[in-house]
């Protein structure tokens, strides 16, 4: 889908660039696949802010997406493509031959009327899902499971994809967008193709109000705060902060590695930081 630009009838429209959604469904979502969604306002279970600069925004309904794709050998037809306010990718409503409806992540080049299927071995065409052991090497994939039966976790946002680059001893090797090369069990499911809406990254909201509609509040810089609020705060007039960039809690930011999961380090063949170190 193309990008839409607007005549500069106001400052907010001058900068506005949106994805053209004219081909998407214009009605309500499928009622049987929708749940209520309570806003958190960036607060955790104890009521304290755990993520700053969140709150407000338009009311949403949660669309229940099938990330597992374990309904094997039953063809499904794409009924329509839809916008989903809870993610950057578009979603597709599919109807299985037995009458069941489901939402799946829409890959690029998937159209209304196309047939998709999940199987142990299926055609390599966008929207078809199968275990990694059944795919040809070099296939572009998305919605990849990290553990069998857990549901897809890798490459789910707009325009993302991974590539199957090898198989060995019960594991598949996949290359991620970040440059990371990692192993997952070859029984994990993945869907063929790249995720829809690749132009999402080129959108420009044009004005602060559109950010507020999405539930994002103003992001205040540390150097604009008082010393009590941030290590970069205070000073007479405008300052540069006077130290290496840190978080509000004093931990180094901008480039500091934060990964702490030694149990799964063995599955990472090449770190996403490897090419930067050269």
From Swiss-Prot:
* Gene Ontology terms, MF aspect: rRNA binding; structural constituent of ribosome; transferase activity
**rRNA-binding: present as a keyword of the record?**
yes
Keywords tagged on the record = Ribonucleoprotein, Ribosomal protein, RNA-binding, rRNA-binding
User: Which stretches of sequence are listed as region Disordered?
Assistant: 222-264
* Entries under Pfam families matching the protein: Ribosomal_L2, Ribosomal_L2_C
List, alphabetically, the Gene3D superfamilies matched. Answer: 2.30.30.30, Nucleic acid-binding proteins (2.40.50.140), Ribosomal protein L2, domain 3 (4.10.950.10)
Q: What GO terms fall under cellular component here?
A: large ribosomal subunit
Record carries keyword Isomerase: no
Domain of life assignment: Bacteria
What GO terms describe the biological role, i.e. biological process, of this protein?
cytoplasmic translation
Please name the HAMAP family in this protein's record.
Answer: Ribosomal_uL2_B
Q: What family does the database annotate?
A: Belongs to the universal ribosomal protein uL2 family.
- Share what the entry says about its subunit structure, partners included: Part of the 50S ribosomal subunit. Forms a bridge to the 30S subunit in the 70S ribosome.
> What's this protein's function?
One of the primary rRNA binding proteins. Required for association of the 30S and 50S subunits to form the 70S ribosome, for tRNA binding and peptide bond formation. It has been suggested to have peptidyltransferase activity; this is somewhat controversial. Makes several contacts with the 16S rRNA in the 70S ribosome.
| Protein name per UniProt | Large ribosomal subunit protein uL2
Q: What is the organism field in this record? A: Phenylobacterium zucineum (strain HLK1)
Q: Which gene encodes it?
A: rplB
